């Protein structure tokens, strides 16, 4: 992890020194993305594996052509339909998150067309709906779960035009602190996003 953070800092310093190639573009943009993959829901002595699908709506501020900051809203939907050793199944949970991220794009695959990007940040998450059904069909519902995570992305972005960018990423979120009950650990998500710079 220390090596990864040092690498990001090096990329950041290089990115901040880059000259603006598209000075006529606004420093503001938006991003819409969706992802799907495996996740683990833990809490109250449970560890349930399942699938999660996510959507994100982000606002971007381009500090330079290589570095941008992002914040917005993410929605995560978790589902586990198989019987586990603890006799829990039909588990459904919905989490809302507010991320603050910094994204670096430095290593160009094709000049001014495609680049490898790295993103890291912090994210506050809260369960807005949680339902756990047991083997005897009893149910428990909770909406008080709150946890902090570190979202990370690595992927490739391709410029469709001066304004539009299409990205493909491998994403994860490492849980760092849980305040109540349940938390969602993303083991590895495939994410697709479209960015528009004003």
Name each region found by the language model.
Residues 26-28, 49-53, 92-98, 114, ...:
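Residues that define the transmembrane beta-barrel architecture of outer-membrane proteins
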Residues 30-38, 71-75, 118-126, 156, ...:
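Transmembrane beta-barrel strands of outer-membrane/channel proteins
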Residues 72, 76-83, 93-95, 141, ...:
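Predominantly the C-terminal beta-signal and adjacent terminal strand-loop region
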Residues 1-26:
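Cleavable N-terminal export/targeting peptides
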Residues 18-61, 197:
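Short glycine/proline- and aromatic-enriched beta-strand/turn motifs that initiate or cap beta-hairpins
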Residues 60-135, 195-198:
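Gram-negative (and chloroplast) outer-membrane scaffold detector with strong preference
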Residues 41-48, 81-87, 128-137, 179-186:
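Outer-membrane beta-barrel translocator domains and adjoining extracellular loop/strand segments
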Residues 19-28, 65-66, 107-115, 160-164:
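Short loop/turn motifs that connect adjacent beta-strands in outer-membrane beta-barrel proteins
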């Amino acid at each position: 992890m220390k090596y990864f953070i040092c690498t990001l800092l090096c990329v950041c310093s290089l990115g901040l020194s880059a000259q603006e190639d598209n000075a006529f573009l606004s420093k503001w943009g938006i991003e819409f993305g969706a992802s799907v993959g495996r996740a683990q829901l833990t809490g109250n002595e449970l560890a349930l594996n399942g699938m999660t699908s996510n959507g994100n709506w982000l606002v971007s501020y381009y500090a330079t052509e290589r570095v941008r900051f992002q914040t917005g809203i993410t929605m995560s939907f978790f589902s586990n339909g198989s019987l586990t050793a603890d006799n829990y199944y039909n588990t459904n949970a919905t989490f809302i998150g507010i991320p603050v991220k910094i994204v670096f794009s430095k290593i160009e695959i094709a000049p001014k067309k495609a680049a490898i990007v790295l993103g890291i940040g912090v994210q506050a998450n809260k369960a807005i709906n949680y339902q756990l059904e047991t083997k005897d069909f009893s149910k428990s519902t909770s909406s008080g779960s709150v946890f902090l995570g570190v979202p990370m992305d690595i992927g490739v972005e391709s410029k469709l035009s001066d304004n539009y960018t299409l990205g493909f990423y491998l994403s994860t979120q490492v849980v760092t602190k849980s305040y109540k009950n349940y938390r969602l650990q993303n083991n590895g998500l495939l994410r697709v996003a479209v960015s528009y710079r004003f």
